Protein backbone atom coordinates (compact mmCIF):
# COMPACT_ATOMS: atom_id res chain seq x y z
CA UNK A 1 0.00 0.00 0.00
CA UNK A 2 1.17 3.51 -0.74
CA UNK A 3 1.33 5.79 2.26
CA UNK A 4 -0.20 8.73 0.41
CA UNK A 5 -3.41 6.69 0.23
CA UNK A 6 -3.45 5.73 3.91
CA UNK A 7 -5.41 7.81 6.42
CA UNK A 8 -2.86 7.89 9.25
CA UNK A 9 -2.71 11.38 10.80
CA UNK A 10 0.26 11.46 13.19
CA UNK A 11 0.75 13.71 16.20
CA UNK A 12 4.07 15.14 17.36
CA UNK A 13 2.87 15.95 20.88
CA UNK A 14 1.50 13.55 23.50
CA UNK A 15 -2.27 14.08 23.95
CA UNK A 16 -2.97 15.60 27.36
CA UNK A 17 -5.54 12.99 28.42
CA UNK A 18 -3.47 9.95 27.39
CA UNK A 19 -1.93 8.53 30.58
CA UNK A 20 -0.15 5.38 29.41
CA UNK A 21 2.21 4.52 26.57
CA UNK A 22 -0.19 2.40 24.51
CA UNK A 23 -2.87 5.10 24.58
CA UNK A 24 -0.37 7.83 23.73
CA UNK A 25 1.31 5.97 20.88
CA UNK A 26 -1.83 4.56 19.25
CA UNK A 27 -3.13 8.13 19.08
CA UNK A 28 0.18 9.69 18.00
CA UNK A 29 0.77 7.08 15.30
CA UNK A 30 -2.71 7.63 13.86
CA UNK A 31 -3.93 4.10 14.64
CA UNK A 32 -7.08 5.35 16.37
CA UNK A 33 -9.00 8.47 17.39
CA UNK A 34 -11.38 9.13 20.28
CA UNK A 35 -15.03 9.86 19.47
CA UNK A 36 -16.23 10.22 23.06
CA UNK A 37 -15.05 9.12 26.49
CA UNK A 38 -14.17 5.42 26.20
CA UNK A 39 -15.25 5.23 22.53
CA UNK A 40 -12.72 5.03 19.67
CA UNK A 41 -12.51 4.77 15.89
CA UNK A 42 -9.89 2.40 14.50
CA UNK A 43 -8.10 4.11 11.62
CA UNK A 44 -6.68 2.01 8.74
CA UNK A 45 -3.36 1.00 10.35
CA UNK A 46 -5.01 0.24 13.69
CA UNK A 47 -7.69 -1.78 11.94
CA UNK A 48 -5.04 -3.86 10.19
CA UNK A 49 -3.51 -4.76 13.57
CA UNK A 50 -6.97 -5.58 14.92
CA UNK A 51 -7.62 -7.84 11.93
CA UNK A 52 -4.27 -9.60 12.43
CA UNK A 53 -5.22 -10.39 16.03
CA UNK A 54 -8.66 -11.57 14.89
CA UNK A 55 -7.04 -13.85 12.29
CA UNK A 56 -4.83 -15.50 14.92
CA UNK A 57 -7.85 -15.96 17.19
CA UNK A 58 -9.94 -17.53 14.41
CA UNK A 59 -7.18 -19.95 13.45
CA UNK A 60 -6.68 -21.17 17.02
CA UNK A 61 -10.39 -21.33 17.85
CA UNK A 62 -11.16 -23.39 14.78
CA UNK A 63 -8.17 -25.63 15.48
CA UNK A 64 -9.71 -26.21 18.93
CA UNK A 65 -13.03 -27.25 17.38
CA UNK A 66 -15.04 -24.04 17.80
CA UNK A 67 -17.40 -22.77 15.07
CA UNK A 68 -18.02 -19.06 14.42
CA UNK A 69 -21.42 -17.37 14.44
CA UNK A 70 -22.64 -13.83 15.10
CA UNK A 71 -25.22 -12.77 17.68
CA UNK A 72 -26.96 -9.40 18.06
CA UNK A 73 -25.47 -6.62 20.14
CA UNK A 74 -28.99 -5.47 21.08
CA UNK A 75 -30.54 -7.90 23.57
CA UNK A 76 -34.04 -8.20 24.99
CA UNK A 77 -34.35 -7.49 28.71
CA UNK A 78 -36.51 -10.59 29.14
CA UNK A 79 -33.51 -12.86 28.64
CA UNK A 80 -31.49 -11.04 31.31
CA UNK A 81 -34.47 -11.09 33.64
CA UNK A 82 -34.81 -14.82 33.07
CA UNK A 83 -31.19 -15.43 34.06
CA UNK A 84 -31.52 -13.12 37.07
CA UNK A 85 -28.81 -10.71 35.90
CA UNK A 86 -30.99 -7.79 34.79
CA UNK A 87 -30.95 -6.45 38.33
CA UNK A 88 -27.72 -7.96 39.68
CA UNK A 89 -25.36 -6.97 36.85
CA UNK A 90 -25.32 -3.35 37.97
CA UNK A 91 -25.04 0.04 36.33
CA UNK A 92 -22.41 -1.09 33.79
CA UNK A 93 -25.18 -2.66 31.70
CA UNK A 94 -26.37 -0.12 29.11
CA UNK A 95 -30.18 -0.26 29.13
CA UNK A 96 -32.75 1.39 26.86
CA UNK A 97 -36.36 1.25 25.69
CA UNK A 98 -37.74 1.11 22.17
CA UNK A 99 -40.70 3.16 20.91
CA UNK A 100 -43.06 0.51 22.30
CA UNK A 101 -41.55 0.89 25.77
CA UNK A 102 -39.92 -2.55 25.59
CA UNK A 103 -36.63 -2.79 27.49
CA UNK A 104 -33.34 -3.78 25.89
CA UNK A 105 -29.65 -3.84 26.74
CA UNK A 106 -26.56 -3.33 24.63
CA UNK A 107 -24.68 -6.57 25.17
CA UNK A 108 -21.94 -6.52 27.77
CA UNK A 109 -21.75 -10.28 27.31
CA UNK A 110 -23.82 -12.95 25.53
CA UNK A 111 -24.53 -15.82 27.95
CA UNK A 112 -28.27 -15.18 27.89
CA UNK A 113 -28.51 -14.89 24.10
CA UNK A 114 -26.47 -18.03 23.37
CA UNK A 115 -28.34 -20.06 26.00
CA UNK A 116 -31.66 -18.98 24.50
CA UNK A 117 -30.43 -19.87 21.02
CA UNK A 118 -29.12 -23.30 21.93
CA UNK A 119 -32.02 -24.35 24.19
CA UNK A 120 -34.39 -24.07 21.23
CA UNK A 121 -32.21 -26.24 18.99
CA UNK A 122 -30.24 -28.76 21.07
CA UNK A 123 -32.50 -31.36 22.69
CA UNK A 124 -30.39 -34.53 22.70
CA UNK A 125 -27.02 -35.63 24.04
CA UNK A 126 -26.27 -36.81 20.49
CA UNK A 127 -25.70 -33.18 19.43
CA UNK A 128 -23.22 -32.52 22.23
CA UNK A 129 -20.60 -31.27 22.82
CA UNK A 130 -20.96 -28.03 20.87
CA UNK A 131 -18.62 -25.02 20.92
CA UNK A 132 -19.63 -21.74 19.28
CA UNK A 133 -17.81 -18.41 19.20
CA UNK A 134 -18.21 -14.90 17.85
CA UNK A 135 -16.20 -11.70 17.50
CA UNK A 136 -18.63 -8.92 18.39
CA UNK A 137 -18.76 -5.39 19.78
CA UNK A 138 -19.58 -5.17 23.50
CA UNK A 139 -20.76 -2.26 25.60
CA UNK A 140 -20.22 -1.40 29.26
CA UNK A 141 -21.09 1.89 30.91
CA UNK A 142 -17.77 2.29 32.69
CA UNK A 143 -17.91 4.86 35.48
CA UNK A 144 -14.45 6.11 34.57
CA UNK A 145 -13.20 5.07 31.13
CA UNK A 146 -9.41 5.35 31.05
CA UNK A 147 -6.20 4.07 29.52
CA UNK A 148 -7.55 4.16 25.96
CA UNK A 149 -8.55 0.71 24.72
CA UNK A 150 -7.81 -0.94 28.07
CA UNK A 151 -10.96 0.36 29.76
CA UNK A 152 -13.50 1.62 27.26
CA UNK A 153 -17.26 1.74 26.99
CA UNK A 154 -17.34 0.08 23.56
CA UNK A 155 -14.87 -2.66 22.68
CA UNK A 156 -14.38 -5.71 20.49
CA UNK A 157 -14.45 -9.11 22.14
CA UNK A 158 -14.21 -12.75 21.14
CA UNK A 159 -16.57 -14.83 23.25
CA UNK A 160 -17.02 -18.59 22.97
CA UNK A 161 -19.54 -20.87 24.65
CA UNK A 162 -19.43 -24.63 24.98
CA UNK A 163 -22.31 -26.99 25.80
CA UNK A 164 -21.91 -30.46 27.28
CA UNK A 165 -23.73 -33.50 28.54
CA UNK A 166 -21.10 -34.35 31.17
CA UNK A 167 -18.59 -32.59 33.40
CA UNK A 168 -15.82 -34.69 31.85
CA UNK A 169 -16.70 -33.29 28.43
CA UNK A 170 -16.56 -29.72 29.79
CA UNK A 171 -13.18 -30.40 31.41
CA UNK A 172 -11.79 -31.70 28.11
CA UNK A 173 -12.96 -28.69 26.07
CA UNK A 174 -11.89 -26.26 28.81
CA UNK A 175 -8.36 -27.66 28.68
CA UNK A 176 -8.36 -27.49 24.89
CA UNK A 177 -9.47 -23.86 24.83
CA UNK A 178 -7.07 -23.00 27.65
CA UNK A 179 -4.29 -24.22 25.36
CA UNK A 180 -5.78 -22.32 22.41
CA UNK A 181 -5.65 -19.12 24.45
CA UNK A 182 -2.04 -19.78 25.39
CA UNK A 183 -1.28 -20.25 21.69
CA UNK A 184 -3.09 -17.03 20.73
CA UNK A 185 -1.23 -14.80 23.16
CA UNK A 186 2.10 -16.47 22.43
CA UNK A 187 1.60 -15.92 18.69
CA UNK A 188 0.84 -12.26 19.41
CA UNK A 189 4.28 -12.10 21.03
CA UNK A 190 2.97 -11.28 24.49
CA UNK A 191 4.63 -11.95 27.85
CA UNK A 192 1.67 -13.31 29.82
CA UNK A 193 0.64 -15.57 32.68
CA UNK A 194 -2.49 -17.70 33.12
CA UNK A 195 -3.73 -17.21 36.69
CA UNK A 196 -6.46 -18.58 38.95
CA UNK A 197 -9.30 -16.06 39.00
CA UNK A 198 -12.72 -15.09 40.34
CA UNK A 199 -15.77 -15.60 38.12
CA UNK A 200 -17.38 -12.32 39.20
CA UNK A 201 -20.76 -11.49 37.67
CA UNK A 202 -20.38 -14.37 35.19
CA UNK A 203 -21.04 -17.06 37.77
CA UNK A 204 -19.59 -20.55 37.67
CA UNK A 205 -16.61 -21.92 39.56
CA UNK A 206 -13.31 -22.96 37.97
CA UNK A 207 -11.87 -20.02 36.06
CA UNK A 208 -8.56 -18.62 34.82
CA UNK A 209 -7.49 -15.20 33.59
CA UNK A 210 -4.79 -14.57 31.01
CA UNK A 211 -2.73 -11.62 32.21
CA UNK A 212 -0.25 -9.62 30.14
CA UNK A 213 2.52 -8.48 32.47
CA UNK A 214 2.64 -4.69 32.61
CA UNK A 215 3.26 -2.03 35.23
CA UNK A 216 0.08 -0.24 34.12
CA UNK A 217 -2.11 -3.31 34.65
CA UNK A 218 -5.14 -2.79 36.87
CA UNK A 219 -4.91 -6.29 38.34
CA UNK A 220 -2.36 -7.66 40.79
CA UNK A 221 -0.95 -11.14 40.22
CA UNK A 222 0.26 -13.12 43.21
CA UNK A 223 2.88 -15.65 42.13
CA UNK A 224 5.36 -18.01 43.77
CA UNK A 225 9.03 -17.16 43.51
CA UNK A 226 9.94 -20.84 43.12
CA UNK A 227 6.97 -22.62 41.46
CA UNK A 228 4.50 -21.94 38.62
CA UNK A 229 1.70 -20.96 41.01
CA UNK A 230 -0.04 -17.73 39.93
CA UNK A 231 -3.42 -16.26 40.85
CA UNK A 232 -5.28 -13.01 40.76
CA UNK A 233 -4.68 -11.48 44.20
CA UNK A 234 -8.45 -11.68 44.80
CA UNK A 235 -8.33 -15.47 44.61
CA UNK A 236 -5.03 -16.37 46.27
CA UNK A 237 -5.80 -18.24 49.52
CA UNK A 238 -3.79 -17.51 52.64
CA UNK A 239 -2.31 -20.68 54.10
CA UNK A 240 -0.54 -19.07 57.05
CA UNK A 241 -1.09 -20.53 60.51
CA UNK A 242 -1.49 -18.25 63.50
CA UNK A 243 -0.51 -19.22 67.03
CA UNK A 244 -1.64 -17.37 70.13
CA UNK A 245 1.11 -16.13 72.38
CA UNK A 246 1.19 -17.47 75.95
CA UNK A 247 0.72 -13.94 77.31
CA UNK A 248 -1.92 -13.80 80.05
CA UNK A 249 -5.18 -12.10 79.13
CA UNK A 250 -5.54 -8.69 80.77
CA UNK A 251 -8.65 -6.88 81.91
CA UNK A 252 -10.54 -5.07 79.15
CA UNK A 253 -9.99 -1.31 79.32
CA UNK A 254 -11.57 1.61 77.50
CA UNK A 255 -9.13 4.42 76.66
CA UNK A 256 -9.45 7.86 75.09
CA UNK A 257 -7.98 8.22 71.59
CA UNK A 258 -8.89 11.78 70.56
CA UNK A 259 -8.82 12.38 66.78
CA UNK A 260 -7.20 8.97 66.18
CA UNK A 261 -9.17 6.98 63.58
CA UNK A 262 -6.92 5.15 61.13
CA UNK A 263 -5.14 1.98 62.29
CA UNK A 264 -1.76 3.66 61.81
CA UNK A 265 -2.82 6.64 63.94
CA UNK A 266 -4.30 4.52 66.74
CA UNK A 267 -1.37 2.09 66.92
CA UNK A 268 1.14 4.96 67.03
CA UNK A 269 -0.89 6.78 69.70
CA UNK A 270 -1.12 3.65 71.88
CA UNK A 271 2.46 2.58 71.11
CA UNK A 272 1.45 -0.84 69.77
CA UNK A 273 1.97 -2.65 66.47
CA UNK A 274 -0.81 -2.45 63.83
CA UNK A 275 -0.92 -6.26 63.98
CA UNK A 276 -2.30 -5.93 67.54
CA UNK A 277 -5.30 -3.98 66.27
CA UNK A 278 -8.59 -5.44 65.06
CA UNK A 279 -9.88 -3.70 61.96
CA UNK A 280 -13.69 -3.64 61.83
CA UNK A 281 -15.60 -3.08 58.60
CA UNK A 282 -19.26 -3.38 57.62
CA UNK A 283 -20.25 -4.90 54.28
CA UNK A 284 -23.60 -5.23 52.57
CA UNK A 285 -23.76 -8.84 51.38
CA UNK A 286 -26.66 -8.96 48.92
CA UNK A 287 -29.28 -7.34 51.19
CA UNK A 288 -27.74 -8.34 54.53
CA UNK A 289 -25.25 -6.38 56.66
CA UNK A 290 -22.20 -8.29 57.93
CA UNK A 291 -19.41 -7.10 60.24
CA UNK A 292 -16.00 -8.28 59.01
CA UNK A 293 -12.89 -8.38 61.21
CA UNK A 294 -9.26 -8.60 60.09
CA UNK A 295 -5.93 -7.87 61.71
CA UNK A 296 -4.85 -4.23 61.56
CA UNK A 297 -2.00 -4.86 59.14
CA UNK A 298 -4.23 -6.86 56.78
CA UNK A 299 -6.86 -5.81 54.20
CA UNK A 300 -10.33 -7.29 53.75
CA UNK A 301 -10.75 -9.20 50.48
CA UNK A 302 -14.37 -8.60 49.48
CA UNK A 303 -14.26 -11.45 46.94
CA UNK A 304 -13.52 -13.88 49.77
CA UNK A 305 -16.40 -12.37 51.76
CA UNK A 306 -18.64 -12.91 48.74
CA UNK A 307 -17.51 -16.52 48.43
CA UNK A 308 -18.15 -17.24 52.12
CA UNK A 309 -21.81 -16.40 51.57
CA UNK A 310 -22.16 -17.42 47.93
CA UNK A 311 -23.41 -13.88 47.37
CA UNK A 312 -24.02 -12.06 44.10
CA UNK A 313 -23.10 -8.57 45.31
CA UNK A 314 -20.78 -7.46 48.12
CA UNK A 315 -20.13 -3.78 48.74
CA UNK A 316 -18.84 -1.64 51.58
CA UNK A 317 -21.67 -0.19 53.67
CA UNK A 318 -22.11 3.58 53.44
CA UNK A 319 -21.43 5.89 56.38
CA UNK A 320 -25.18 6.34 56.80
CA UNK A 321 -25.80 2.58 56.81
CA UNK A 322 -23.05 2.02 59.41
CA UNK A 323 -24.48 4.80 61.56
CA UNK A 324 -27.96 3.28 61.37
CA UNK A 325 -26.74 -0.27 62.09
CA UNK A 326 -24.22 0.36 64.89
CA UNK A 327 -25.03 3.91 66.02
CA UNK A 328 -21.42 5.08 65.64
CA UNK A 329 -18.95 6.54 63.15
CA UNK A 330 -16.73 4.48 60.85
CA UNK A 331 -13.46 5.56 62.54
CA UNK A 332 -14.54 4.11 65.89
CA UNK A 333 -15.93 0.71 64.88
CA UNK A 334 -15.30 -2.38 66.95
CA UNK A 335 -16.90 -5.79 67.57
CA UNK A 336 -17.60 -5.35 71.30
CA UNK A 337 -21.24 -4.79 72.16
CA UNK A 338 -22.62 -5.47 68.70
CA UNK A 339 -26.23 -6.68 68.74
CA UNK A 340 -26.75 -10.44 68.68
CA UNK A 341 -28.71 -10.30 65.43
CA UNK A 342 -25.77 -8.74 63.55
CA UNK A 343 -23.52 -11.40 62.04
CA UNK A 344 -19.77 -11.11 62.69
CA UNK A 345 -17.17 -13.00 60.66
CA UNK A 346 -13.43 -12.80 61.27
CA UNK A 347 -10.22 -13.72 59.51
CA UNK A 348 -8.28 -16.56 61.13
CA UNK A 349 -5.54 -14.14 62.24
CA UNK A 350 -7.97 -12.34 64.57
CA UNK A 351 -8.35 -15.44 66.75
CA UNK A 352 -4.62 -15.34 67.56
CA UNK A 353 -4.59 -11.73 68.81
CA UNK A 354 -3.99 -11.53 72.57
CA UNK A 355 -4.70 -8.28 74.43
CA UNK A 356 -5.41 -6.43 71.22
CA UNK A 357 -7.08 -3.13 70.42
CA UNK A 358 -10.32 -2.21 68.66
CA UNK A 359 -12.74 0.67 68.28
CA UNK A 360 -15.20 1.22 71.14
CA UNK A 361 -18.14 2.18 68.88
CA UNK A 362 -17.86 5.62 70.45
CA UNK A 363 -16.18 8.67 68.90
CA UNK A 364 -12.68 9.24 70.36
CA UNK A 365 -12.42 5.94 72.30
CA UNK A 366 -10.89 2.50 71.78
CA UNK A 367 -10.69 -0.69 73.82
CA UNK A 368 -7.34 -2.24 74.75
CA UNK A 369 -6.62 -5.73 76.12
CA UNK A 370 -9.26 -7.11 73.75
CA UNK A 371 -9.54 -10.88 73.34
CA UNK A 372 -11.87 -12.70 70.96
CA UNK A 373 -14.57 -14.97 72.37
CA UNK A 374 -14.13 -13.45 75.84
CA UNK A 375 -15.00 -9.91 74.76
CA UNK A 376 -16.97 -10.36 71.55
CA UNK A 377 -18.70 -13.05 69.53
CA UNK A 378 -17.61 -14.36 66.14
CA UNK A 379 -20.15 -16.31 64.11
CA UNK A 380 -17.56 -17.72 61.73
CA UNK A 381 -13.81 -17.69 61.11
CA UNK A 382 -12.59 -17.85 57.49
CA UNK A 383 -9.82 -16.74 55.16
CA UNK A 384 -10.96 -13.16 54.55
CA UNK A 385 -7.82 -11.17 53.82
CA UNK A 386 -5.72 -10.38 50.77
CA UNK A 387 -2.53 -12.38 50.50
CA UNK A 388 0.61 -10.28 51.00
CA UNK A 389 4.10 -10.34 49.53
CA UNK A 390 6.26 -12.60 51.67
CA UNK A 391 3.37 -14.91 52.61
CA UNK A 392 3.81 -18.61 51.95
CA UNK A 393 2.72 -19.64 48.45
CA UNK A 394 -0.61 -21.54 48.57
CA UNK A 395 1.01 -24.53 46.86
CA UNK A 396 3.55 -24.74 49.68
CA UNK A 397 6.46 -23.91 47.37
CA UNK A 398 8.28 -20.64 47.95
CA UNK A 399 6.91 -17.26 48.93
CA UNK A 400 4.51 -14.86 47.25
CA UNK A 401 5.62 -12.00 45.04
CA UNK A 402 3.42 -9.46 43.21
CA UNK A 403 3.27 -8.29 39.59
CA UNK A 404 0.82 -6.09 37.71
CA UNK A 405 -1.19 -7.49 34.82
CA UNK A 406 -3.62 -6.51 32.06
CA UNK A 407 -6.42 -9.05 31.72
CA UNK A 408 -6.80 -10.00 28.05
CA UNK A 409 -8.59 -13.34 28.36
CA UNK A 410 -10.83 -15.21 30.79
CA UNK A 411 -12.10 -18.79 30.70
CA UNK A 412 -14.91 -20.11 32.92
CA UNK A 413 -16.55 -23.39 33.77
CA UNK A 414 -20.09 -22.03 34.11
CA UNK A 415 -21.65 -25.40 34.90
CA UNK A 416 -25.45 -25.15 34.96
CA UNK A 417 -25.66 -21.55 36.23
CA UNK A 418 -27.47 -20.29 33.10
CA UNK A 419 -29.04 -23.48 31.79
CA UNK A 420 -30.93 -24.08 35.04
CA UNK A 421 -32.08 -20.46 35.29
CA UNK A 422 -33.23 -20.45 31.66
CA UNK A 423 -34.47 -24.05 31.46
CA UNK A 424 -31.99 -25.10 28.77
CA UNK A 425 -32.20 -28.89 28.93
CA UNK A 426 -31.46 -32.00 26.89
CA UNK A 427 -32.32 -35.69 27.03
CA UNK A 428 -29.41 -37.90 28.10
CA UNK A 429 -28.76 -41.41 26.79
CA UNK A 430 -31.23 -42.78 29.36
CA UNK A 431 -33.97 -40.42 28.25
CA UNK A 432 -33.73 -38.25 31.37
CA UNK A 433 -34.03 -34.46 31.18
CA UNK A 434 -30.89 -32.65 32.39
CA UNK A 435 -29.61 -29.08 32.26
CA UNK A 436 -26.88 -28.32 29.73
CA UNK A 437 -23.42 -27.96 31.24
CA UNK A 438 -21.69 -24.83 29.94
CA UNK A 439 -18.30 -23.22 29.54
CA UNK A 440 -17.51 -19.63 28.58
CA UNK A 441 -14.31 -18.25 27.07
CA UNK A 442 -13.61 -14.56 26.38
CA UNK A 443 -10.80 -12.54 24.80
CA UNK A 444 -10.70 -8.75 24.70
CA UNK A 445 -9.64 -8.31 21.07
CA UNK A 446 -9.23 -4.52 21.07
CA UNK A 447 -7.73 -4.73 24.56
CA UNK A 448 -5.18 -7.24 23.26
CA UNK A 449 -4.10 -4.67 20.64
CA UNK A 450 -3.52 -2.15 23.44
CA UNK A 451 -1.67 -4.73 25.55
CA UNK A 452 0.67 -5.50 22.66
CA UNK A 453 1.31 -1.78 22.18
CA UNK A 454 1.97 -1.46 25.92
CA UNK A 455 4.60 -4.20 25.89
CA UNK A 456 6.17 -3.34 22.53
CA UNK A 457 7.31 0.27 22.30
CA UNK A 458 10.32 2.50 22.87
CA UNK A 459 10.96 6.22 23.20
CA UNK A 460 10.38 6.74 19.47
CA UNK A 461 7.16 4.83 18.92
CA UNK A 462 5.51 1.45 18.55
CA UNK A 463 7.50 -1.75 17.89
CA UNK A 464 5.01 -4.30 16.55
CA UNK A 465 5.78 -8.04 16.62
CA UNK A 466 5.79 -9.31 13.04
CA UNK A 467 2.67 -11.48 13.52
CA UNK A 468 0.44 -8.47 14.21
CA UNK A 469 2.25 -5.59 12.48
CA UNK A 470 0.05 -3.74 9.97
CA UNK A 471 2.81 -4.23 7.36
CA UNK A 472 6.01 -6.25 7.41
CA UNK A 473 8.23 -3.76 5.59
CA UNK A 474 8.29 0.05 5.36
CA UNK A 475 10.02 1.26 2.18
CA UNK A 476 11.13 4.91 2.38
CA UNK A 477 12.64 6.78 -0.56
CA UNK A 478 14.38 9.77 1.02
CA UNK A 479 13.70 12.03 -1.95
CA UNK A 480 10.67 11.27 -4.11
CA UNK A 481 11.83 13.91 -6.60
CA UNK A 482 14.85 11.75 -7.42
CA UNK A 483 13.96 9.53 -10.37
CA UNK A 484 16.54 6.93 -9.28
CA UNK A 485 15.33 6.73 -5.66
CA UNK A 486 11.69 6.63 -6.70
CA UNK A 487 12.27 3.89 -9.28
CA UNK A 488 14.38 1.73 -6.93
CA UNK A 489 11.83 2.14 -4.12
CA UNK A 490 8.91 1.21 -6.37
CA UNK A 491 10.76 -1.84 -7.71
CA UNK A 492 11.53 -3.00 -4.15
CA UNK A 493 7.91 -2.36 -3.18
CA UNK A 494 6.61 -4.47 -6.06
CA UNK A 495 9.11 -7.31 -5.72
CA UNK A 496 8.60 -7.67 -1.95
CA UNK A 497 4.85 -7.84 -2.46
CA UNK A 498 5.36 -10.56 -5.05
CA UNK A 499 7.37 -12.46 -2.41
CA UNK A 500 4.30 -12.39 -0.14
CA UNK A 501 5.28 -9.53 2.16
CA UNK A 502 2.90 -6.76 3.17
CA UNK A 503 4.67 -3.53 2.26
CA UNK A 504 4.03 0.15 2.97
CA UNK A 505 5.68 2.55 0.51
CA UNK A 506 6.15 6.11 1.77
CA UNK A 507 5.55 7.91 -1.52
CA UNK A 508 4.93 11.28 0.11
CA UNK A 509 7.01 14.34 -0.75
CA UNK A 510 7.71 15.07 2.92
CA UNK A 511 11.15 15.84 4.35
CA UNK A 512 13.26 12.82 5.31
CA UNK A 513 13.04 13.68 9.02
CA UNK A 514 9.24 13.62 8.91
CA UNK A 515 9.25 10.27 7.11
CA UNK A 516 11.66 8.69 9.60
CA UNK A 517 9.74 10.05 12.61
CA UNK A 518 6.48 8.63 11.24
CA UNK A 519 8.19 5.32 10.47
CA UNK A 520 9.39 5.06 14.08
CA UNK A 521 5.88 5.85 15.33
CA UNK A 522 4.31 3.20 13.06
CA UNK A 523 6.78 0.57 14.32
CA UNK A 524 6.83 -1.79 11.33
CA UNK A 525 9.37 -4.64 11.79
CA UNK A 526 11.69 -3.73 8.89
CA UNK A 527 12.50 -0.37 7.32
CA UNK A 528 14.20 -0.11 3.92
CA UNK A 529 15.59 3.35 3.23
CA UNK A 530 16.36 4.22 -0.38
CA UNK A 531 18.84 7.11 -0.30
CA UNK A 532 21.88 8.54 -2.04
CA UNK A 533 23.42 5.13 -2.75
CA UNK A 534 20.40 4.01 -4.74
CA UNK A 535 22.28 4.57 -7.99
CA UNK A 536 24.88 2.08 -6.69
CA UNK A 537 22.16 -0.49 -5.97
CA UNK A 538 22.59 -0.14 -2.18
CA UNK A 539 19.87 0.53 0.40
CA UNK A 540 19.79 0.70 4.20
CA UNK A 541 17.83 -1.92 6.14
CA UNK A 542 16.88 -1.18 9.75
CA UNK A 543 15.32 -3.62 12.23
CA UNK A 544 12.81 -1.68 14.31
CA UNK A 545 13.00 -3.94 17.39
CA UNK A 546 16.77 -3.60 17.81
CA UNK A 547 17.46 -0.39 15.83
CA UNK A 548 20.29 -2.28 14.10
CA UNK A 549 20.92 -1.18 10.53
CA UNK A 550 23.04 -2.35 7.62
CA UNK A 551 23.70 -1.42 4.02
CA UNK A 552 22.44 -4.15 1.70
CA UNK A 553 22.66 -4.63 -2.05
CA UNK A 554 19.26 -4.59 -3.71
CA UNK A 555 19.85 -8.03 -5.24
CA UNK A 556 20.45 -9.45 -1.72
CA UNK A 557 17.46 -7.69 -0.15
CA UNK A 558 14.96 -10.55 -0.35
CA UNK A 559 17.29 -12.99 1.39
CA UNK A 560 18.27 -10.41 4.02
CA UNK A 561 14.66 -9.53 4.89
CA UNK A 562 13.59 -13.18 4.87
CA UNK A 563 16.25 -13.89 7.49
CA UNK A 564 14.96 -11.04 9.69
CA UNK A 565 11.30 -12.05 9.40
CA UNK A 566 11.71 -15.83 9.56
Curated annotation (Swiss-Prot):
Which BP terms in the Gene Ontology apply to this protein? prolyl-tRNA aminoacylation
Presence of keyword Aminoacyl-tRNA synthetase: yes
Alphabetic keyword roster? Aminoacyl-tRNA synthetase, ATP-binding, Cytoplasm, Ligase, Nucleotide-binding, Protein biosynthesis
Q: State the PROSITE patterns in the record.
A: AA_TRNA_LIGASE_II
What is the protein's major site of localization?
cytoplasm
Catalytic activity entry: tRNA(Pro) + L-proline + ATP = L-prolyl-tRNA(Pro) + AMP + diphosphate
Subcellular localization, as worded in the UniProt entry: Cytoplasm
Q: Which GO terms describe its molecular function?
A: aminoacyl-tRNA deacylase activity; ATP binding; catalytic activity, acting on a protein; proline-tRNA ligase activity; transferase activity
Member of which family? Belongs to the class-II aminoacyl-tRNA synthetase family. ProS type 1 subfamily.
Q: Matching NCBIfam families, A to Z?
A: PRK09194.1, proS_fam_II
Q: Write out the function statement from the record.
A: Catalyzes the attachment of proline to tRNA(Pro) in a two-step reaction: proline is first activated by ATP to form Pro-AMP and then transferred to the acceptor end of tRNA(Pro). As ProRS can inadvertently accommodate and process non-cognate amino acids such as alanine and cysteine, to avoid such errors it has two additional distinct editing activities against alanine. One activity is designated as 'pretransfer' editing and involves the tRNA(Pro)-independent hydrolysis of activated Ala-AMP.
Comment, domains? Consists of three domains: the N-terminal catalytic domain, the editing domain and the C-terminal anticodon-binding domain.
Q: How does it assemble?
A: Homodimer.
Name of this chain's protein: Proline--tRNA ligase
Species the sequence originates in: Bacillus cytotoxicus (strain DSM 22905 / CIP 110041 / 391-98 / NVH 391-98)
Amino acid sequence: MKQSMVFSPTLREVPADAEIKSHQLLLRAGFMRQNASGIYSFLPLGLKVLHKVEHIIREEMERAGAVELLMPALQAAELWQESGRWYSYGSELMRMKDRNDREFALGATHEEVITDLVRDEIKSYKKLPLTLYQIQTKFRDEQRPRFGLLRGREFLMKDAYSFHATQESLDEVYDRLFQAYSNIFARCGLNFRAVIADSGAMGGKDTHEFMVLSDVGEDTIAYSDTSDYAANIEMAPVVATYTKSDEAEKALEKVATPDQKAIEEVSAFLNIEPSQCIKTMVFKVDEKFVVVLVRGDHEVNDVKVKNVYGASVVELASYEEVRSLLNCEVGSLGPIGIAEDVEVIADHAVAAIVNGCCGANEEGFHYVNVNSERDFKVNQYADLRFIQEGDQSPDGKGTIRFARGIEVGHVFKLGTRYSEAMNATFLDENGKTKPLIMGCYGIGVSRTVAAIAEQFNDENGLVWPKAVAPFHVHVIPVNMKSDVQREVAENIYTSLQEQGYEVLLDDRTERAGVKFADADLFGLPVRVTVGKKADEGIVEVKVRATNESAEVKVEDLHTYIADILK
